[in-house]
A protein has these predicted regions:
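Short, basic/hydrophobic alpha-helical segments
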Residues: 39-60
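Short, well-ordered alpha-helical microsegments
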Residues: 69-73
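Glycine-rich, often acidic, oxyanion-interacting loops/wings at catalytic, nucleic-acid
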Residues: 136-176
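Gly/Thr-rich phosphate-binding beta-strand-loop-beta motif of the actin/hexokinase/Hsp70
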Residues: 2-22, 109
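Acidic beta-strand-to-loop metal/phosphate-binding motif
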Residues: 8, 56-66, 109
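Short, glycine/acidic-enriched loop or turn micro-motifs at the edges of active sites
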Residues: 13, 67, 90
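Short alpha-helix plus adjacent loop in nuclease-associated cores
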Residues: 77, 84-136, 140, 171-176
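Short glycine-rich, Thr/Ser-proximal phosphate-binding strand/loop in the N-terminal lobe
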Residues: 14-41
Length: 176
């Protein structure tokens, strides 16, 4: 039987907390520690894990979706690791788990991945993600423009300048 290891990652901007769970219900969940959040450190970690447990070991990893995006998942998949990204809102929690630390989160993810209790989200292709980012940036710019225009109108109104009904369509001249 092939050996399987389940890796829980708590990914942040600067560092990644790692826990590794061995297969089997009674398999131990060990804290690996923290590595810096860069792709070379991640590659060194996977290489070291394979050297320790043998090249035939199956590695499965997961982390919660967040602002760091899908780069970690894509790199792990390139290295031959099955990687799942899970929505934090769909991660089961126990009633007493109030204290959150990076180490505990990594351990919990490794344990839940081994138990099969996590549901992965779709990891978009880089081109799809780029289009999504561009659409979000445009939407943010449109919202910022509207808010700025409303702030300026409120400022002018506070200082006695009223916008007449017939002039409302001419605001383009003021703001461009």
């Amino acid at each position: 039987m092939k050996k399987e290891l389940y890796i829980g990652l708590d990914v942040h901007r600067e560092a990644v907390a790692i826990a590794v769970a061995e297969q089997g219900r009674k398999g131990e969940v060990r804290d690996y520690g923290q590595i810096s959040n860069d792709l070379h450190a991640l590659e060194r970690f996977i290489t070291r894990l394979r050297q320790t447990h043998g090249k035939r070991v199956t590695l499965r990893a997961c982390y919660e979706a967040g602002p760091c995006g899908f780069g970690v998942a894509r790199r792990l998949q390139q290295l031959g690791v099955e990687c799942a990204v899970v929505a934090p809102s769909l991660t089961p929690t126990r009633a007493g788990d109030r204290l959150k630390t990076d180490k505990r989160d990594a351990r919990k993810l490794a344990r839940l991945l081994r138990a099969g209790e996590l549901s992965a989200i779709y990891i978009p292709e880089p081109t799809d993600e780029a289009i999504r980012d561009l659409c979000r940036a445009r939407s943010d710019a449109v919202d910022d423009r509207r808010r700025s225009r409303n702030r300026l109108k409120a400022f002018l109104l506070r200082h006695g300048y009223r916008c007449q009904e017939s002039e409302r369509g001419k605001h383009q001249e003021l703001f461009h």
